[in-house]
């Protein structure tokens, strides 16, 4: 048993040491990226910021600076991709949203989006109230309040019922938000121009054309093809290698 305990302690020590080493390496890479960015050496800056992400360090500043470096380097699709990746973690960040909009203005395609569905409108409304973490914390707080009121503080029993209701509503809201987010994955077109086909085969009729930086929604895959939808409801098939997924 003693040897097992020592092994566990050693494993935990090595894990913590590795995490600290990764954090320090990420900080060094981030500072190197900032220096290269200020010197307008965008290739070096991009490589450094990618190293930060490879170390598992995800911050708004890393995604923002990486997107900016790609944009300054003339790589619009990559800049859009990393602003979008940043918004997966920091959904309401004004800087990421502003720079994304600026980069999107450089795209060739001008697509008029369809109105949001009822489910999408509800999803956005709930996220405007609180993000996923906020709903999770709310559910936990009111669940604890219910437990305290029910078992520890008899005088608070009158708030036990309302606390349980709020906890359940917050929890169900969290599940709804997570389900929507898990079911949706978008991608960015990375080719200067790509033909969207009516069927998943090379000689299929061309449905329409898209250009670098356009955001698409993959809905189905078949061999080397991906069926995609765009914001105006049009759909078709493209070669999977011509897009990069926002969630990887």
Enumerate the language-model features and the residues they cover.
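Boundary regions of SH3-family modules and the immediately adjacent low-complexity/disordered segments
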Residues: 76, 154-194, 198-208, 217-219, ...
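Membrane-embedded alpha-helical segments of integral membrane proteins
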Residues: 109-152
């Amino acid at each position: 048993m003693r040897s097992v305990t020592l092994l566990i302690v050693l494993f935990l020590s090595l894990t913590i040491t590795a995490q600290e080493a990764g954090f320090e390496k990420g900080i060094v890479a981030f500072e190197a990226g900032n220096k290269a960015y200020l010197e307008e050496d965008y290739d070096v800056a991009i490589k450094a910021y990618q190293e930060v992400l490879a170390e598992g360090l995800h911050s708004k500043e890393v995604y923002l600076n990486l997107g900016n470096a790609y944009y300054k380097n003339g790589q619009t699709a990559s800049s859009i991709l990393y602003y979008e990746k940043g918004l997966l973690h920091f959904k309401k960040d004004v800087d990421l949203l502003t720079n994304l909009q600026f980069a999107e203005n450089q795209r060739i395609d001008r697509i008029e989006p369809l109105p949001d569905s009822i489910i999408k409108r509800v999803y956005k409304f709930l996220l405007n109230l609180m993000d996923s973490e906020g709903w999770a914390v709310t559910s936990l707080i009111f669940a604890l309040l219910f437990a305290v009121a029910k078992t520890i503080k008899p005088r608070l029993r009158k708030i036990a019922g309302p606390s349980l209701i709020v906890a359940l509503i917050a929890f169900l809201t969290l599940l709804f938000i997570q389900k929507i987010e898990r079911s949706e994955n978008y991608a960015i077109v990375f080719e200067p121009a790509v033909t969207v086909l009516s069927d998943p085969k090379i000689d299929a009729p061309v449905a329409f054309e898209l250009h670098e930086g356009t955001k698409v929604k993959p809905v189905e895959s078949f061999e080397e093809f991906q069926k995609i939808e765009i914001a105006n409801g049009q759909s078709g098939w493209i070669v999977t290698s011509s897009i990069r997924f926002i969630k990887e």
